[in-house]
Amino acid sequence: TKNLIIMLLLVTAFYFASTSYNSSINYYIEDVLNLPPTFIGGFLAVVGILGFIANLTFTPLLAKHFKEVNVCKVITLCLSISLSLMILFKNTTLFLTSAIIFTTFASIHIPLQQSIITKLSKGNYGSLMGVLNSSKAIGQVTGSLLAGFIFDLGNKLPFLISALIILIAFIIMLPMNSNVTESNIV
């Protein structure tokens, strides 16, 4: 269906941005911010823990009180905004705070994607999971490849392109009806 195609495009865009971010953030912190590898490890550990906590606490609350499609739209926009803030901020603390916000929203976004797509599948889980994994793989490969090629051209370019890709995915997602998943629950 149209909504399923939109969601698969969103998955591809999300994994493009996420992988581009993951491929670039370590180099950016070390090369541009001149912070040591021990800081990078500590930062990534803190970010992972915060994402885990956000996923455990906010994802069930948001899903309980709001329609999943609407939450997914808002979080998709927040992902684009947080990446955009990373581009704008020259201050190290503000840049890293934006990175934390991005990864926290990303950790909430993944279960929402999976839930919406599962509900849109109409019981055809096996083949749909194959298509879902292909969408993820396309995003991961292209995100990593592009980030690697363009980082030397501009160290914030991977974040900029990721912000734009996610913004385009948000715009594509706008026509989705917020009730689209409720009528498809098996």
Predicted regions and their residues:
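A late C-terminal transmembrane helix in Major Facilitator Superfamily
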Residues: N124-L153
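Intracellular juxtamembrane helix-capping segments at the cytosolic ends
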Residues: I108-S121
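Structural signature of the two symmetry-related core transmembrane helices
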Residues: N70-L85
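Conserved extracellular-gate-facing transmembrane-helix segments in secondary transporters
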Residues: A13-N22, A106
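Helix-to-loop junctions at the C-terminal end of transmembrane segments
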Residues: A54-K67, F151
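Short amphipathic helix-loop junctions that connect adjacent transmembrane helices
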Residues: S23-F39
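Multi-pass alpha-helical transporter architecture, strongest
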Residues: S162-V186
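Helix-loop junctions at membrane interfaces in 12-TM secondary transporters
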Residues: I87-S98
